[in-house]
């Protein structure tokens, strides 16, 4: 008959008893107890240990916990906070009468500050939800040189493969009288180039990903990949408030959202976002040095050929781009798994020693013991995502404001240029 090795709860001496025996007596100190009591005591100690880890402060006897993931209400709050902060910042600029010259140092500082609103909204959400932003937004992951190179390649192929679709969409808008004035990148010197890289690539890449993927998409993860990626990409597109960028922002939002969902590593999205902005900015700057001004280069990006022919060409190139991006994303996911491990919830087990071999005797769900497979299934069923009326209201308010703002900006370009 197999024997289980344990320790005496009174003196700590090594014990052994035959499986099936209920009573156990320590030969060293004479203490007597049952194996059932031992199991119950061990579970009680584990619960107390978990409480000590979770307990950071105690106010009026209430246990304060730090969560490690966002829910859908956090996504809604993130949208509302972004809208509220944007309105507040606009009011401040209007009241103070601050005006800056395009391309000046103050302009790029202001641009970086505006981009910082995304990050500030994410921080406020984390604080209000008592959630660790670093863990919930998956900022505790690592990257290496291969990941950086693959992120650059994905951004480049995305721009080459899907950029023509954006141009066709702009041609379509222009056909109906849409004005592209003020919507192109203008860089006249090296310092303006550095300013654009800092504000539009570094700050924007981090701040926007922190909110859109780290908070909004993370809050939708329990709803499945299609909902999480699709909704975050849609909000990402609308929040930019530019009809010119509609197609591009939607495509890049889906692309980055998919990578984040599969890897649970925010830094991959930040890198792809950075290079997605860095490549066209660098292209415009180099071309302006070689032969033409950036304004002339930008002017040539629309109105070439008929819309129909351009669309056919764009779709063919987009299909090729989709094929190569799939290959690159698979390599990126594999490299991320090599550096950080697979993207799955940690499974913890407790074990006792049986004839010198470790045997799993307890299953846990998110750190809590599940006694049977039936309990595990019931717990999973209970995790079916739901949405409250308050969350729906927050999404509705933020969404309505953003859509109206987007429509006003778009219509004004049709009517007044």
Listing of model-derived features with the role each one plays in the protein:
Residues 1-48:
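Cys/His-rich metal-coordination motifs, chiefly Zn-binding "fingers/knuckles"
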Residues 56-83, 132-163, 345-347, 368-400:
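Interfacial transmembrane-helix boundary/kink motif in multi-pass membrane proteins
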Residues 76, 80, 109, 148-153, ...:
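Hydrophobic alpha-helical transmembrane segments
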Residues 81-127:
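Alpha-helical transmembrane segments in multi-pass membrane proteins
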Residues 83-90, 116-124, 155-160, 310-330, ...:
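Hydrophobic core of alpha-helical transmembrane segments in multi-pass integral membrane proteins
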Residues 87-92, 238, 245-314, 323-327:
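Functionally important transmembrane alpha-helices
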Residues 102-108, 134-204, 403, 407-417:
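Juxtamembrane helix-loop-helix connectors linking adjacent transmembrane helices
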Residues 160, 182-246:
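Function-critical hydrophobic alpha-helical transmembrane segments in multi-pass membrane proteins
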């Amino acid at each position: 008959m197999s024997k289980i090795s344990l320790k005496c709860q009174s003196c700590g001496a090594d014990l052994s008893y035959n499986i099936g025996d209920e009573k156990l007596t320590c030969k060293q100190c004479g203490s007597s107890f049952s194996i059932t009591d031992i199991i119950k005591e061990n579970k009680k100690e584990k619960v107390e240990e978990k409480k000590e880890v979770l307990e950071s402060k105690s106010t009026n006897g209430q246990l304060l916990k730090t969560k490690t993931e966002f829910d859908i209400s956090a996504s809604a709050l993130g949208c509302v906070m972004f809208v509220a902060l944007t309105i507040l910042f606009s009011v401040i600029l209007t009241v103070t009468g601050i005006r800056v010259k395009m391309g000046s140092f103050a302009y790029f500082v202001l641009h970086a500050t505006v981009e910082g609103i995304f990050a500030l909204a994410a921080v406020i959400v984390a604080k209000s939800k008592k959630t660790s932003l670093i863990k919930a937004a998956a900022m505790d992951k690592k990257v290496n040189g291969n990941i950086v190179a693959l992120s650059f390649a994905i951004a480049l192929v995305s721009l080459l493969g899907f950029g023509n679709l954006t141009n066709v969409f702009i041609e379509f808008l222009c056909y109906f009288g849409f004005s592209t004035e003020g919507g192109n990148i203008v860089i006249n010197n090296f310092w303006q180039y550095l300013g654009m890289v800092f504000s539009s690539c570094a700050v924007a890449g981090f701040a926007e990903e922190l909110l859109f993927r780290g908070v909004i998409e993370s809050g939708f993860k329990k709803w499945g990949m299609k909902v999480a990626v699709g909704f975050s990409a849609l909000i990402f597109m609308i929040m930019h408030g530019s009809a010119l960028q509609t197609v591009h922002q939607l495509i890049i939002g889906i692309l980055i959202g998919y990578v984040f969902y599969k890897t649970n590593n925010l830094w991959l999205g930040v890198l792809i976002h950075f290079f997605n902005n860095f490549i066209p900015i660098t292209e415009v700057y180099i071309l302006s040095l070689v032969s033409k001004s950036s304004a002339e280069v930008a002017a040539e990006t629309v109105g070439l050929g008929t819309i129909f022919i351009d669309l056919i060409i764009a779709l063919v190139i987009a299909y090729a781009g989709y094929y190569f991006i799939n290959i690159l994303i698979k390599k990126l996911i594999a490299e991320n798994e090599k550096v950080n491990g697979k993207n799955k919830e940690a499974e913890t087990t407790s074990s006792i020693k049986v004839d010198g071999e470790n045997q799993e005797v307890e299953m846990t769900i998110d750190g809590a013991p599940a006694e049977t497979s039936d309990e595990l299934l019931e717990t999973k069923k209970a995790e079916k995502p739901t949405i409250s009326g308050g969350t729906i209201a927050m999404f509705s308010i933020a969404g309505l404001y953003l859509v109206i703002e987007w429509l006003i900006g778009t219509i004004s370009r049709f009517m007044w240029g």
